[in-house]
């Protein structure tokens, strides 16, 4: 089962203890997570159900919601089960699965947000050429590329992280298996891997982020040249939701993966990880539904149809 360097399981110390205050926090977090799962699932169903939302923009938004549902499902069920049962062990395979899915979904979301920025650029700056610049074929290719690039990063991180010897070190002071936290337990020189991971994070975060900034710089210039006040308002309303989501996601991701090692602390890692795995997925459907009249219209039509069916 185990020798001096092989560890068949790990112990996740978790996010909460069993004090009264932490029990209340746990219930609040659980409520937020359930709301997040409901909101993102509803967004996916609305986009699939309402033909008015069958456009590249909303297809990409449905993929963002799918990634958020999977991201929450990767970490929270295990955390909740551990807290309620007191069993904190996670197998090596289970830990590897979490390490794989988190970069897959997080990295995929980086590229997906860049694809969504390009979609808004094409719609605002070149509305007449939009069907050509953002064809369904291109949209599907970009979406597939986002998933594949994220999966490649996740696979590399999972294989490399679990290849290190851990010399019987079991306890992970976190609520899920995350590469930067787990690598600290390794009883081998991980500097080459950490440097490679840092470079990879720079590429996966800053390259898409630069594309997003460039897209919105061009969008802003185009909006300022619009003569119609109504057109300006519509363009700002369409893009402001995406800008808010980008700010939340990239802020948390850059803080987590691009801080110098000397500035890292376990408590900060837990808080930031909780933010981008639990709270950001909740905010995405709220931001897009509140700011978007088409989504609100689809929700109203869906509720009306449900009421009509219930009366039959």
Swiss-Prot record:
Where is it mainly found?
membrane
Which residues are reported to be glycosylated?
3, 17
Membrane topology per the entry is: Multi-pass membrane protein
Where are the membrane-spanning stretches?
A: 27-47, 56-76, 97-117, 144-164, 202-222, 235-255, 270-290
**What InterPro entries does the record tag this protein with?**
GPCR_Rhodpsn, GPCR_Rhodpsn_7TM, Olfact_rcpt
An example GO CC term for this entry is:
plasma membrane
Role = Odorant receptor.
Recorded protein name is Olfactory receptor 2T8
Q: Which organism is it from?
A: Homo sapiens (Human)
- Lineage of this protein's species? Eukaryota, Metazoa, Chordata, Craniata, Vertebrata
Q: Gene name?
A: OR2T8
């Amino acid at each position: 089962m185990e020798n001096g360097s092989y560890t068949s399981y790990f112990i996740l110390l978790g996010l909460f203890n069993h004090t009264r205050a932490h029990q209340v926090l746990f219930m609040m977090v659980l409520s937020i997570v359930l709301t997040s799962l409901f909101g993102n699932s509803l967004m996916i169903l609305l986009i699939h159900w309402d033909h008015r939302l069958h456009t590249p923009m909303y297809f990409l938004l449905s993929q963002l919601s799918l990634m958020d549902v999977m991201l929450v499902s990767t970490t929270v069920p295990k955390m909740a089960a551990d807290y309620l049962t007191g069993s904190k062990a996670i197998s090596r395979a289970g830990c590897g699965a979490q390490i794989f899915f988190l970069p897959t979904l997080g990295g995929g979301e980086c590229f997906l947000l860049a694809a969504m920025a390009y979609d808004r650029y094409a719609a605002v700056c070149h509305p007449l050429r939009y069907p050509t610049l953002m064809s369904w074929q291109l949209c599907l290719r970009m979406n597939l590329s986002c998933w594949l690039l994220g999966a490649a990063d996740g696979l590399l991180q999972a294989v490399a992280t679990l290849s290190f010897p851990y010399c019987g070190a079991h306890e992970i002071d976190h609520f899920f298996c995350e590469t930067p936290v787990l690598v600290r337990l390794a009883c081998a020189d991980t500097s080459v891997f950490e440097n490679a991971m840092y470079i990879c994070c720079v590429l996966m975060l800053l390259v898409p982020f630069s594309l997003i900034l460039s897209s919105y710089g061009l969008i802003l210039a185009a909006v300022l040249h619009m003569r119609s006040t109504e057109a300006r308002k519509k363009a700002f309303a369409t893009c402001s939701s995406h800008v808010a989501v980008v700010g939340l996601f990239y802020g948390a991701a850059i803080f987590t993966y691009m801080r110098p090692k000397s500035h890292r602390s376990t408590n900060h890692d837990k808080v930031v990880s909780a933010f981008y795995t639990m709270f950001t997925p909740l905010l995405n459907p709220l931001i897009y539904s509140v700011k978007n009249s088409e989504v609100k219209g689809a929700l109203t039509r869906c509720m009306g149809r449900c009421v009509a069916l219930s009366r039959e």
